[in-house]
Curated annotation (Swiss-Prot):
Organism: Zymomonas mobilis subsp. mobilis (strain ATCC 31821 / ZM4 / CP4)
Protein name per the record: Glutamate 5-kinase
Family that this chain belongs to: Belongs to the glutamate 5-kinase family.
One Pfam family per UniProt: AA_kinase
Gene that produces this protein: proB
Positions contributing to ATP binding: 40, 200-201, 243-249
A Gene Ontology molecular function term of the record: glutamate 5-kinase activity
Record localization: Cytoplasm
Superkingdom of origin organism: Bacteria
A cellular component term, taken from the record's GO annotations: cytosol
Length: 397
């Protein structure tokens, strides 16, 4: 069936004209344009009013993922639904949200059910899946951010589909509707994805509530999020989505596009929603800021450097060629820092070359300065990462 679906989408893509492809929001997220994609599925789509998984619908999502995986696209799933599933199993009122304790207990039980469901449905498509539980704080701490990024890279390189959810069983402030929108954007940032798709019960951002205003129009593309965009998504706007709905999605779009990642809001209320969106592009696309300043602002502007790494001319040239910084090219280290801190990278004339997140603390960095990769494990006494600063966690200045 996966092969048939792959054939179907290939044929439909070939039939599109060049003009339609250029104007189609969905084309931005196809494998040839988006090698790594994050999709977010909310509770209202995954779980019905009785607290049961919409398995038939979710199976079509699994088929979508499988055919795109077969086409070479790496996909990460951010999945809600644990609290709703756990609440039904425990017979708790108000969907498990009557109290913080109920929500945490529901999440603890529901996470197993959710993970089993994804593993079964993706397994039926010959795909392995993994479970990662995070809170937004995990991606704010730079050391944990590096670990999340490295884990995702390895899983995706092994052909695994990571399924990520908030760790609601221990989270407090994070337990509120919409957090997985922001989490999906953060995952897009940490995984260096090209795109994030938020599947929702609405098909995009509207100028007004389309259920009440016949003149409401969907905004197909947003190139810059400004006050008017936020006003349409606010809780007191005519769209009526509230702070837990469209407002969180627009905030997610701000996070994603700020980091150079395209984000789309589209409907999930149809079978094979991923395939359908790639075909018709029905939704709102928030376009990525692809300028260097966006990445500099994220890494260089918002964070304070905790140390300095001085490198030789060969390393300078290697960095300009897009390579990671290896210990062999380092001449000296200054400052006191921990793994995951931001450090400045300078040449021997003290010119600032780049800034990045370092993989070792200052003590270990000093020990391996100027050393070749094969020497690192013997020096430190443990199997360590090859790069001192990975190219994915570095911005040239």
């Amino acid at each position: 069936m996966v092969a048939d679906l792959t054939s179907d989408i290939s044929e439909s893509q070939e039939q599109e004209t060049e003009t339609n492809s250029a104007n189609n929001n969905g084309a931005v997220f196809r494998p040839e344009n988006c090698p790594r994609l994050v999709i977010k599925i909310g509770s209202s789509l995954l779980v019905d009013q009785r607290g049961q998984v919409r398995r038939d619908w979710l199976q079509t999502v699994a088929y979508d993922i499988a055919k795109l995986h077969q086409a070479g696209q790496q996909i990460i799933v951010v999945s809600s639904g644990a609290i709703a599933l756990g609440a039904r199993r425990l017979n708790l009122p108000r969907g498990g949200r009557a109290s913080l304790e109920d929500a945490q207990a529901s999440a603890s039980v529901g996470q197993i059910l959710l993970s089993q469901c994804w593993a079964e449905l993706l397994g039926a498509c010959s795909l392995d899946s993994s479970q990662i539980l995070l809170t937004l704080d995990d991606l704010e701490d730079r050391r944990r951010y590096l670990n999340v990024s490295a884990t995702l890279d390895r899983l995706l390189s092994l052909g695994v589909v990571p399924v990520i959810n908030e760790n609601d069983s221990i989270a407090t402030a994070e337990i509120r509707f919409g957090d997985n929108d922001r989490l999906a954007a953060r995952i897009g940032q940490a995984s260096h994805a090209s795109g994030v798709i938020l599947f929702s019960d609405v098909d995009g951002l509207y100028t007004a509530n389309p259920m009440k205003d016949p003149n409401a129009k969907r905004i197909d593309r947003v190139e810059h999020i400004d006050n008017s965009t936020e006003a349409m998504a606010s809780s007191d706007s005519a769209s009526g989505m509230g702070s837990g709905g469209m407002a969180s999605k627009v905030e997610a779009a701000r996070i994603a596009t700020y980091s150079g990642v395209n984000l789309a809001i589209t409907t999930g209320k149809r079978p094979s929603p991923l395939t359908m969106f790639l075909d018709d592009g029905a939704g709102t696309l928030f376009t990525a800021d692809e300028s260097a300043s966006a990445h500099k602002t994220w890494l260089a502007g918002r964070l304070t450097a905790h140390g300095q790494v001085y490198i030789d001319q060969g390393a300078v040239e290697a960095l300009h060629d897009g390579n990671s910084l290896l210990p062999a090219g380092v001449c000296s280290i200054e400052g006191k820092f921990n793994r995951g801190d931001v450090v400045d990278i300078l040449d021997q004339e003290h010119n600032l070359i780049a800034r990045g997140l370092i993989e070792y603390d200052s003590e270990d960095s000093a020990q391996i300065t100027g050393k070749r990769s094969q020497e690192i494990a013997d020096i430190l006494g443990y199997e360590a990462r090859t790069a001192l600063i990975h190219r994915n966690h570095m911005v040239m200045l």
